[in-house]
């Protein structure tokens, strides 16, 4: 068994995407520029599509799976953190899904939101943009747009993925990384 025949699988993965050797990708998957798929991550798209935007990171042990009627869609500059599950749901741009959180079929997480570690967003739930969600079942506990902070986190993971692609596992230390962070924080257009 093992990996399916590549000729029968539709994958559109940008050439700049870093995928850990232990990650497993099955089915119709699109991944945008600068994204990363970390160790032991599994993406399965048997009957619907998985679409992952640009500069998004799927961290260690993440599971992305489609529902029977629902694709899994993750926007640009998102962080889906360790052991989180996105199952047939939509995560809009600039979101962070916390460690061990679960987002179920038909749910929509609005732009710039955070789903707290361990939260469960149940089927069909619509979370407004700029929300913090916590609990089981997940409920909005705070309204604040975290798009800027979430985007910075995604940029940091982009930096780390570039280093891993070169075989460097200590990318977040030293002056070069600090310069990268400072440059990212400079006001635009000045």
Ranges and model annotations:
Residues 1-13, 46, 54, 60-62, ...:
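Glycine-rich hexapeptide-repeat left-handed beta-helix
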Residues 8, 12-57, 61-66:
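A positional/architectural concept
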């Amino acid at each position: 068994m093992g990996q399916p025949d590549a000729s029968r699988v539709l994958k559109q993965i940008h050439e700049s995407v870093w995928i850990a050797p232990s990650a497993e990708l099955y089915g119709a998957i699109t991944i945008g520029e600068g994204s990363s798929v970390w160790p032991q991550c599994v993406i399965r798209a048997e009957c619907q599509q998985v679409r992952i935007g640009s500069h998004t990171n799927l961290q260690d042990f993440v599971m992305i799976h489609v529902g029977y009627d629902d694709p899994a869609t993750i926007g640009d500059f998102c962080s889906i953190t360790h052991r989180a599950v996105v199952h047939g749901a939509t995560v809009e741009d600039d979101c962070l899904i916390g460690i061990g959180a679960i987002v179920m079929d038909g749910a929509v997480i609005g732009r710039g939101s955070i789903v707290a570690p361990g939260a469960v967003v149940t089927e069909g739930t619509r979370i407004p943009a700029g929300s913090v969600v916590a609990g089981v079942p997940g409920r909005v506990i705070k309204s604040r747009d975290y798009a800027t902070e979430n985007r910075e986190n995604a940029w940091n993971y982009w930096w780390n993925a570039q280093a891993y692609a070169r075989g460097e596992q200590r990318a977040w230390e030293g002056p070069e990384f600090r310069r990268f962070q400072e440059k990212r924080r400079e006001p635009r257009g000045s």
